[in-house]
Amino acid sequence: MEKQIDTDRSFKKLTVRLKWRCWKRRILTAGVAAMVMIGIMSAFWWWEQEGITVPESAGQPGIKPGGNCAVLVLGNGCRVDLQKDCDTLQLPGISWDHRKGTIVYDGRENKTGWPERNTLMVPLRGEYRLVLGDGTKVWLNSASSLNYPVQFAEKERCVELDGEAYFEVTPDPERPFIVKSGDVQTRVLGTAFNFSAYRGENASTITLLTGKVAVSAPGHAERVLLPGQQLKYDAENRKTVIKEVDAEDFVVWKDGLFLFNDCGLEEIIPRLSRWYGVTFHYDREKFGDLKFYIKTRRYEDIGTILNLLKLTENVTYSIEGNEVTLYRTGENK
């Protein structure tokens, strides 16, 4: 069964496709398995060379989406709010455009007194783009931080990540680019990849788009990834799994999109929580059999994506302040 619904007149050719299959009850079984497929097609928002300008939200009033927000911590401990201080503070060799959420380091400058390492911190409901001194481009997702040298050393380029980032590494065969996150280390020469390793979550995930990377983790020999491969390391049981994926699905967040492909709520909720800065409440057991396909813009109010979940006729919700509660349809609130 397929339905087409005009969910927002402000966007032309906006299509919602709803498919579901109800599995028949079988003798001695107590549950019903369901697969829900929701697709949404809307305008794409692409990064310009210098960054992206976040559009006005066109969603219903409610909890607003995130946007360009970051704090730059200098080597001497000084903190620069890139939203408030960007028009008044000047630093040698560093420029930024907060409207486009971009900070750029000029690697040609090396002045005495420069801090050795900086940290770019992106809070909940934030995102930012960084161009390092070697020209490497980094997109930082919400609730993430990157520690890096103002100028890289002669033998290697090493950064430390907490959270999620997409890297487009400038090739330099003489200086491998190394990303460290906890016990996991990724070494590249020049490539594009996504690295997700949030503190408090057991899994670290590296997804390769182009080039080649070598990943090392405790208890495992170095593993080499090829384009279209994803490595997931479970820190709790120290297991590593490599599988083939559509790598583009894992980096569309940098282009202003949410894409959940055959995902359960346990995968969807953390991303929504970080981006909208809200707390979700739901009974995992009641939603364990549901999988979703959702594609929509990140810059809509939270009600837009919650209403997409509601279209499945399996999910309802309530919002109170910054807390969202999800219910299985028919469940008493």
What are these regions (language model features)?
Residues M1-K13:
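A short, acidic loop/turn at secondary-structure junctions
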Residues L14, L18-K19, W23-V32, S42-K333:
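A residue-level detector for the "anchor" residue at the start of short, highly conserved motifs
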